[in-house]
């Protein structure tokens, strides 16, 4: 595996093709805050439109939701209330139990939580299981007010925390491999036992490369 680290602040409409065209998959990593958000969203659009395998982790998943809202559903102002509290389309919003939290230190949704996977989904094929548990570190989540519209347009919630009805995993119906996860699979991945998401992501990259060679 040859890794290419690309700072999202270097990605814009004029540089995206040059920076991203030769990649066999694109990972948008976790993070916080507004810095580099526009570049992440542009990279995700490139992956979606060019059928490049994509994995978004935590903020990376949230950026995928924002990108889809803006460029597929036409929610031009779609954003997370973390970056834009007054957005007309808060497709990512603070979790209900976090709204009255004043002290931010150590008060995020932390730790291991269960997740139910949608039968027949790509993610269920990755895990080969119907129920999983993954570790979390976040305050913001997919806004279920928009879930029906997203699913009708092809972005499907394929992993849910049934206890709180939280969207934990999204994937695109008409894409070879496009998955976003709210949790952190890297917390459960080691050299000796790599996480199945990363294993399948690399397999998707290999398949993409083979198709480009043809």
Feature-to-residue mapping (PLM):
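Short, surface-exposed acidic
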Residues: 77-81, 130-136
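Cysteine-nucleophile active-site neighborhood
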Residues: 18-114, 119-122, 198-209
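Conserved beta-loop-beta connector loops within the AMP-binding
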Residues: 122-132
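Acyltransferase
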Residues: 1-13, 18-19, 132-168, 172-214
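Generic signal for short, ordered secondary-structure residues
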Residues: 26, 102, 128-129, 180
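Sparse, context-dependent recognition of short Cys/His-centered cofactor- or disulfide-binding micro-motifs
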Residues: 11, 54, 68, 76, ...
